[in-house]
Amino acid sequence: MNRPVFPVYHFLVSAAILVFVVIFWRTHHRDHRNWLALRLFVLCSVNRWPLRMVKGTVVGTTDTLREMQRYEQLSSTGLTTGKSSREHRYMIRLLLSLVRVCAGIICQCMTIPYQPHRG
């Protein structure tokens, strides 16, 4: 059963602040009331952002965990992309060849003796 924990907690904290304000307002002098009003404004303003921060962290962590599990599942079945492993190897070889050609051209332009990697 899924219970709305955060809204109930937020309501209880807000109700406790309200009760405290009413009691304090009736029992203290005007100078104390002005200072209290400023404090309560800050407290009530800050009361909302921790809730959003916690919710955002929980949701972000959950989404990241789901994505990791999905990636692991796709990796184990070999469905990470539509390309086969042969196509991947071909693309890697092509990229490495391009890098070697570019390195050779750069070394020629800079008059550095080029030594290709043997492997």
Curated annotation (Swiss-Prot):
| Cellular compartments annotated | Cell inner membrane
Locate the transmembrane regions by residue number.
5-25, 94-114
Q: What would you give as a GO molecular function for this chain, any one? A: transferase activity
Query: Its Enzyme Commission number?
Result: 2.7.-.-
Where is the signal peptide, in residue numbers?
none
Principal cellular location given in the protein's record: membrane
UniProtKB keywords: Cell inner membrane, Cell membrane, Membrane, Transferase, Transmembrane, Transmembrane helix
A Gene Ontology cellular component where this protein is annotated is:
plasma membrane
Topology in the lipid bilayer is annotated as: Multi-pass membrane protein
Disulfide bonding pattern of the chain: none
The entry's family comment says: Belongs to the phosphoethanolamine transferase family.
State the protein's name: Putative phosphoethanolamine transferase YjgX
Provenance organism: Escherichia coli (strain K12)
Designated gene of the protein? yjgX
